[in-house]
Amino acid sequence: MKLKLSLLALLCSAGSVMAESAPKNIIYMIGDGMGPAYTTAYRYFKDDPNTKVVDPTVFDTILRGMAHTYPDDHTYVTDSAAGATALSSGHKSYNGAIAVDTDKKPVKTMLEVAKERGMTTALVATSQINHATPASFASHNESRRNYDEIANDYIDNKIAGKLPVDLMLGGGTKYYVREDRNLVEEFKAAGYQYSDDFAAMNDLKQVPALGLFAEVGLPFALDENPTRLTQMTTKALDLLDGQNDKGFFVMIEGSQIDWCGHANDIACAMG
């Protein structure tokens, strides 16, 4: 009994310390599809062949643990949607699910919690901004393939009377400027700054803002501008820093790590 009470006291005190030291800002970085095979390949890619020891990489220094990633369906390998739903909400679901459970009911995401708490919210991705991973933080849909519906969610859904995402940087003009609806104009009407020119991204001076720099996904880093994600991340943090006394939440995805894997292109993946 004494051991149990001591453990309870320890947990309670730890909870108190954690509550007192909760971070003001949250930066959530995701390498889509980036399993152990990628980090191993990167270790060999970066290694100095003139030494006998395989040198550790930055990923080796920050590794804190691993988790099972199987979805809640009859398959063994997760997809980006089920994986991102688990990461954003803590709920396992079926492959293709966008922040819904196995009954296709919405589950609350950490971005939505942040918005409810008055924080500024942001999504940055090298895919279209309504692709599976970013979508699973700010939308709810039974299928990741419903790209138009997901894009609509970003302006139709309200959290505490406000749009869910204050800053979005990525691709996706194909889904935002359509024959049936022009979401870009709707975002502008809602007070968002807008840019579709990556070279002019710095013209975005404040949030809310929307930057769509490709029709679908951005060019692969191997082919064009290898620092594009770094530049978008830097811009996002510049816009978010100090903007809100309650802090910010931003999800940043290296989307095309996964796309290179699907293509079985090791050079693309390491780029």
Please state what every model-predicted region is.
Residues 1-19:
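Gram-negative bacterial Sec-dependent N-terminal signal peptides
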Residues 24-34, 114, 212, 247-258:
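Beta-strand elements within well-structured catalytic alpha/beta cores of enzymes
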Residues 132-138, 216-224, 244-271:
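Active-site His/acidic residue clusters
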Residues 143-147, 225-233, 268-271:
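Phosphate/oxyanion-binding active-site loops and adjacent basic polyanion-contact surfaces
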Residues 154-158, 205-209, 213-219, 224:
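Formylglycine-dependent
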Residues 163-167, 187, 195-197, 201-212, ...:
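Active-site regions of oxyanion-processing enzymes, predominantly non-cytosolic
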